[in-house]
């Protein structure tokens, strides 16, 4: 929510969970920045996080988001990183209190290349999901993905 010109706004978020992930309600300030042409965008949110049905429901979360378009828009590097406190147990019964998750993405924007139709809004790329102690997992996980996306 932003009703003023300053780069700081109010951020309200709901994360709905299924089964082993509890519902969470988040609120806090957000700082957002962008270059004049929006080729570079950055945001950070520092939030209070209430997690339903958790033994310790009062927590925090820090989130960073970014988008960088470069080489005349041919390539995009974007993603987010979250760090939060949440008491939980992994599949082996080990207790964890902090979680880190990031999902950087790299895209090749085909319609920005010579001899490619400008209406072909197709990008090919990859996302790398990396997390530590997320959900019922113990330790660090890396899940690479190949992807295609259409930009409307």
What are these regions, as identified by a protein language model?
Residues 140-152:
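Outer-membrane beta-barrel "beta-signal"
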Residues 47-95:
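Short helix-loop boundary/capping segments
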Residues 15-25, 50-59, 88-98, 132-142:
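Solvent-exposed loop/turn segments connecting transmembrane beta-strands
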Residues 78-88, 92-110, 119-126:
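An amphipathic alpha-helical core segment
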Residues 1-34:
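Hydrophobic alpha-helical segments and helix pairs
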Residues 27-29, 62-66, 104, 146:
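Membrane-embedded beta-strands of outer-membrane beta-barrel proteins
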Residues 1-9, 34-43, 69-77, 110-123:
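Short loop/turn motifs that connect adjacent beta-strands in outer-membrane beta-barrel proteins
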């Amino acid at each position: 929510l932003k009703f003023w010109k300053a780069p700081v706004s109010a951020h309200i978020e709901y994360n709905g969970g299924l089964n082993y992930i509890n519902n969470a309600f988040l609120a806090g300030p957000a700082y957002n920045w962008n270059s004049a042409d929006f080729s570079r965008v950055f945001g950070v949110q520092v939030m209070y996080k209430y997690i339903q049905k958790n033994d310790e429901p009062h927590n925090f979360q820090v989130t960073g988001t970014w988008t960088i378009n470069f080489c005349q828009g041919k390539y995009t590097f974007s993603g987010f990183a979250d760090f939060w406190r949440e008491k939980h147990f992994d599949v082996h019964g080990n207790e964890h209190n902090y979680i880190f998750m990031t999902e950087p993405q790299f895209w090749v924007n085909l319609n920005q290349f010579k001899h490619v139709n400008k209406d072909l809004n197709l990008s090919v790329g990859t996302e790398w999901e990396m997390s530590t102690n997320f959900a019922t997992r113990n330790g660090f996980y890396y899940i690479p993905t190949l992807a295609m996306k259409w930009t409307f």
